[in-house]
Amino acid sequence: MKILPPAPRFRTSLFSTLALGAALLTACGGGSGGGAPFAGLPIAPPAPAPAPSPATPPPAAPAGRWTVGDLHVHTIQSDDTQQISTLDRVLAKAFDTFGLDWVALSDHLRLSFYDNDGHKLPAQIPFSKGMADYQVPRIKALQASGKYADKTIFASFEWDMATHDHGNVGILTDSPMSDAALKAVSQFEYLFTNRDAALFPAADVAAWGPKAGTGYNTHAETMQAVAWLKKNYPATSYLQINHPSRNPGKYTIAQLREMNDLAPDIVFSLEGMVGNQMEPDRGGYNSAYIDANLPSRTYGGVDHLVAKLGGTWDALLSEGRRIWNVADSDYHFTTSRGLYSSGYAPGEYAKNHLFGDIKDPKSLLAAMRAGRLFAVNGDLIDALDFQVKSSKGAGRMGTELAAAAGEELQITVRFRSPERNNFEYQLGSGLYANVKPVVDHIDLIAGDVTGREQPGTPGYDRATSPSTRVVKRFTRADWKLDAEGYYAASFTVKAGANQYFRLRGTNLGTDVPGETANGEPLPDARTEGNDNVARFNAINARNYADLWFYSNPVFVKVAAK
């Protein structure tokens, strides 16, 4: 999204470039504990446990590996990008520069003006045609030539959801990016947008029948599209809710429940760690700065639905819903023409760390559904091992663990941070400041799982989870460096009611003025200034001074002894 040089607004945050550069270096190591993480030598590993008897072999390790990727990436074929964002350049940033393993391209499902190389088309075309004629052939040609042959790339699209905001839709079919898959995207665009039927082949229009909507401005029309995906591609499609709170009043929790109830294998992810972080209003959340719009702010760069402890995401998890949080770049461009700023390149700032046996788009979708994922900004951490153990086994992110009432649950957290992140000074110089991200604390968050709310009852509108709380705050006093280079900590809790556990970590202390209060993130302020270059550097420093990660939950189902 293009951002013009901003005018002054309520609640501003003015920065000088040099001051923020210094502040960044302070904030990365500052906070409730101060200093760097435990820097002792690696401790000796514990003595190995006796080998299990042949009658009780250890459980097999989960198949797969950790991968890193982005589900929300635009190119020049979107109507609000810039000439610098050709397909080849975007893929080069994602894979060659920032080392991602997988990318879902997600250009707007609107009229498209350009081909994949940025050449202006003689006439506007539906993006589904641009995908079929330009984007997919180029992806296939690159991979056939050996370029990115070991990467997973596929074409999805960002849909303007009727009466809501944006959703990423992937229609993979049994053969992603095949002629059948591309035809399905074209049919979706015909049925569920206001595109003129004359823009589509007459034979297809005759076969598809009348368009699904009229004004494309009701929630019911969005539900029609979800139902269509479920009917036709129940196992090979998804709809991700993008930047859900960017504009006030776009979703109620009842509507989110309704979509997930209808198609739980399709509507299962929220883009809580939003892209467009280079905008003056972080994430492009630029509604009026008034108290009524506090739910439409970001909090440490995270959407209110996810950032609010005991809020919407926790309310959904408290029902046992498998709805996951993700982090995406929403890349259009970083800066353009020295005037505008938008977001970071794929893999530069926002990352999804996803575990799975990922070889292609279908296995990627399966891994996303499984939910063994943590999302992070600014490479605060680059590895996380989060387990809850009972007498029945071990639960990991996205799974459910059985436990007996009253038994001790052993919760372990192991994490690692890289030697540096991608903070540049000056922005765009290619000169990295060699700032090592430092975790100040990690919150272990727990909430009770009380069962599904039913349509037509007051509970279906419940957008809070009163039982959700921080049960343990880990600091450098709690963790130790282990033999594998991870900082490790543990905590024991008694199994009571059905519960879930999740993690949230930051480089900030618990009470940093303007940033956190009692460990909770505060709403992000607008960053502005009349000098464009200084403003770009201030925005960049703001983002790298305020880093968070969020894990997906581990569910625990408790049975009576």
Question: What do these predicted ranges mean?
Answer:
Residues 35-36, 109, 174-182, 272-283, ...:
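Short, solvent-exposed beta-strand-terminating loops
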Residues 129-131, 173-192, 256-277, 345-362:
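Acidic, His- and aromatic-enriched active-site or binding-groove loops in soluble protein domains
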Residues 40, 44, 52-66, 70, ...:
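C-terminal functional module detector
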Residues 78, 200-343, 438-462:
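Domain-core and long-helix interface of multi-subunit machines
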Residues 54-251, 307-308, 328, 513, ...:
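A metal-dependent hydrolase metal-coordination microenvironment
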Residues 117-126, 169-171, 254-257, 284-289, ...:
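Short secondary-structure boundary/capping segments
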Residues 2-18:
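Bacterial N-terminal signal peptides that target proteins for export
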Residues 3, 20, 24-57:
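Bacterial Sec-dependent N-terminal signal peptides
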